């Protein structure tokens, strides 16, 4: 996961128009591909949870994720209606849709459950850690951290083996590059900063898959750089 700089100004014109029509709701909003496109561009074409690349803004390639679930935040039972609130909408991958439950992840595995690990919260995203084994986690110091790890491991299923393997590969590739460039010596700050810049940048509006894994690794190395 990485921080998503959510901006209501990025919502598409079709959604703004729809919100002014009588009896508007999520189901009768017919221009969802325009919404998908806006969400993907805002996120640099990666999933809001696992950070895998989402290639196209259509319903066969991605889900419109309601961070606060539609089934709860629909304007009933004293809850606000967030079903068309742009600040509640994210782009999620398909998460192995159609597979057995234990093989699903992201929005597909989350379903109607609520999570606290909010990719739009910069402070919470600052708690995210990765390790050489490819796992994503939060260092536990309090009850909130335990709940965040439950979200990562169970509700979102982000430590499913396929995702762990992909993150581990990125980590190992960077380690190999470091050894090739510097051997047993500490890397230079200029080299590390250049790599951070590369992994933080968007190529034609698109982040690299799981870019935050690389950025986390490189920022750790930067502390030891010379």
Q: Language-model features: where?
A:
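Class I S-adenosyl-L-methionine
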Residues: 1-29, 103-120, 161-183, 192, ...
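Histidine-centered nuclease catalytic patch
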Residues: 52-91, 95-104
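Long, low-complexity, intrinsically disordered segments enriched in glycines and aromatic residues
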Residues: 100-159, 163
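C-terminal, charged low-complexity interaction regions
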Residues: 141-226
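Short, charged surface segments at domain edges that flank catalytic/cofactor-binding sites
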Residues: 3-49, 73-84
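Short Fe-S-cluster ligation motifs
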Residues: 11, 75-94, 122-137
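Short, well-structured alpha-helical interface segments that form or flank functional binding sites
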Residues: 34, 42-45, 59-62, 84, ...
